Amino acid sequence: VTGWALALPWLALAGLYARGWLRLRPRGRGRLADGRRAALALLTALAYAWALQPTRASAFFLHLLRHGMLAFLAPALLWSARPFAIVLWGAPPALRRAWAARLGPTSPARGLARHPLAAGVAFLSLYLLPLDPGLYAWLGQHPAAQQAWHHGLSWSAVLFWWHALHAAPRWKPRPGTLQRVIVPLAALPVHTGVGVALTFAQSPAYPDVPVAAQVTAGYALWVLGGLTLTWAALRPLARLIGLEARKPALALPRGLPEAER
């Protein structure tokens, strides 16, 4: 572990979220947050701020674990809190109007935010990039390139999970349940293939990394990403089943014989 890399964009967004949350929070309420929410917030901050040295064999497991947190756990937790409207409430009026203009009907940013396929391709491409042993070693020798890749992975993951969890504001058309299930499931086979390849490897694929460390890292990455993607796919199905269960029972016509009821 080499220290903490607190990126300015994440700090700014966290500050706007805190300001908006305090503005929207009912006055006179008790605690600011319970233990569960505080733990999830700490875990999300840890994923975005933790800096590791990937060239050491002892840090290989922790490095891939951070990749999994950046790609799956942290953005999923981030969007589960529905922060879009809260951040807008925390932003100054001038910045709020500028963001609204960027998300206008003819904005390229709005077009990208409406297409889950482009977000998924960008996310999976950046996620798979350093799993190549040659590229992994090259990134370890070039800290600037490695930092740029980390930022690209984190932002592409945020955009991917924007679609997977349907965290967009009202101007984005609401997808059906089937589309909300397909988006996370489409990434599951690719992620599973990576996890299986690392977990069942018989020889070291990365320089200065023992097979045991490679297998442990692959298993952790496989389980972390697989559970998060499966949860995202089952979430809309569980909500649909819950809505069906809460529907009132159909009233039977009067006058039917008891045997037909």
Which sequence ranges carry the predicted segments?
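Alpha-helical membrane segments of multi-pass proteins
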Residues: 1-261
